[in-house]
């Protein structure tokens, strides 16, 4: 980790984003409350940043919005991809550039399963953000998978909130330095709380990023013990195995 980098609290990060008048987006969270967006509401100044929040908890209602999953799973990579695509598309459809010529749109999403009551299944989740680096740029995406190690659902919810804030902040303020995006994911968190075992960055801002090498940074930085690639070079989570 970069010991010289100043680590901001979740409130400080959320407030800086809220005070940036050009950032504007949607938060869609499933499975662990609205733990990410609450940081932005509590920080203050969120009215110009948050276009909408949504938590489609009921499976039938969620399917009506994002479509059904082939294997019936709701905490999976394809779900996060659909959530990002749908929510970002709605912003472009409903908010005209004539009225908001300088806005950088974004859609944040997570789909999470926290540890169950009997502690027989560990919590995990998919997190993603689709975002612009300028009002005229094509969007980029960052998607990651995390496994939670805490033995309490409430603690895992709190970790979910912190990780989401770190991802959003890193996307906007560190996108030119992908390794720093990774490092910042653990701001105010540690390996005992969660393990990030997959990350994928795509879009014009990451045109020079080799995602396989980026995933190896997860091991190098101590975020996970191993990473997996598909035959075509795509990053996979251990949960795919």
Regions found by a protein language model. Give the residues of each.
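Conserved small/polar residues in nucleotide/adenosyl-binding loops
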Residues: 239-241
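Short alpha-helical segments enriched in small residues
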Residues: 2-146
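Long, mid-chain structured domain cores
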Residues: 94-237
């Amino acid at each position: 980790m970069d010991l010289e980098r100043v680590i901001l609290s979740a409130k400080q990060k959320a407030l800086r984003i809220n005070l940036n008048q050009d950032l504007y987006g949607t938060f869609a969270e499933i499975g662990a409350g609205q733990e990410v967006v609450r940081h932005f509401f509590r920080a203050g100044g969120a009215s110009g940043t948050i276009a909408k929040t949504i938590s489609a908890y009921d499976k039938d209602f969620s399917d009506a919005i994002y479509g059904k999953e082939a294997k019936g799973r709701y905490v999976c990579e394809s779900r996060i991809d659909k959530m990002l695509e749908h929510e970002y598309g709605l912003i472009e459809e409903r908010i005209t550039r004539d009225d908001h010529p300088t806005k950088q749109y974004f859609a944040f999403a997570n789909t999470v399963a926290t540890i169950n009551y009997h502690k027989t299944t560990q919590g995990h989740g998919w997190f993603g953000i689709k975002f612009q680096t300028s009002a005229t740029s094509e969007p980029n995406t960052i998607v990651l998978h995390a496994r939670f190690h805490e033995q309490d659902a409430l603690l895992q919810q709190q970790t979910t909130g912190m990780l989401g804030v770190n991802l959003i902040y890193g996307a906007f303020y560190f996108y030119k330095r992908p390794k720093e995006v990774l490092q910042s994911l653990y701001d105010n968190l540690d390996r005992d709380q969660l393990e990030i075992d997959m990350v994928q960055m795509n879009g014009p801002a990451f045109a020079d990023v080799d995602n396989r090498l980026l995933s190896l940074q997860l091991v190098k930085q101590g975020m996970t013990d191993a990473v997996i690639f598909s035959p075509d070079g795509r990053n996979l989570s251990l949960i795919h195995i």
